[in-house]
């Protein structure tokens, strides 16, 4: 993983946006997750940030932020509900026409910098990337499970029992003590 891109505060807005965007993408693809994205967004926007993605079961804030994540989860899950107190601004995380989560600036609206929303939008794009990565991992895992089960069904006598136990364990299933299939 590369060293983080450090963007000075005196850089132009475009330079700051580009640098923060690269850091967010690096965080997602490097496996640092939405917590790191929230931290980067908070630092760039100058306010605490929460990211809530119900589809992933994720609700995170930057370190040190004070927020009731259960309230933010409910808010993100119940679209159209009144914005909870302590949420200064929000940007939806959208996939096509579907809103799958929110990036929330925490605090008072008056305290937000004029370019804070730009950084929240970057966090929304990075969050969407995280959703795509997680869903791709899940799909690959499902395909591996399906092909393993098909192989067990099609040629049960040709497979080495130790290999079956090993492969099942890699897919999260402990067959070391045996199993019964109905």
PLM region descriptions:
Residues 1-182:
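Hydrophobic, helix-rich cores of sensory/ligand-binding and other regulatory modules
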């Amino acid at each position: 993983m590369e060293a983080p891109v450090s963007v000075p505060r005196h850089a132009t807005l475009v330079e700051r946006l580009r640098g923060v965007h690269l850091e967010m993408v690096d965080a997602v693809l490097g496996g640092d997750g939405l917590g790191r994205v929230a931290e980067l967004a908070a630092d760039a926007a100058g306010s605490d940030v929460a990211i809530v993605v119900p589809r992933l079961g994720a609700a995170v804030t930057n370190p040190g932020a004070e927020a009731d994540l259960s309230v933010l989860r409910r808010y993100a899950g119940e679209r159209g509900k009144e914005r909870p107190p302590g949420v200064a601004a929000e940007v939806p995380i959208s996939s096509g026409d579907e809103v799958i989560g929110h990036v929330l600036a925490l605090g008072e609206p008056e305290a937000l910098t004029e370019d804070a929303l730009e950084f929240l939008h970057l966090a929304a794009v990075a969050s969407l990337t995280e959703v795509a990565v997680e869903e791709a991992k899940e799909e690959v895992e499902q395909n591996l499970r399906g092909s393993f089960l098909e192989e067990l069904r099609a040629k049960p006598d040709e497979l080495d029992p130790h290999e079956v136990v090993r492969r099942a364990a890699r897919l999260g299933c402990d067959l070391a003590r045996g199993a019964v299939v109905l």
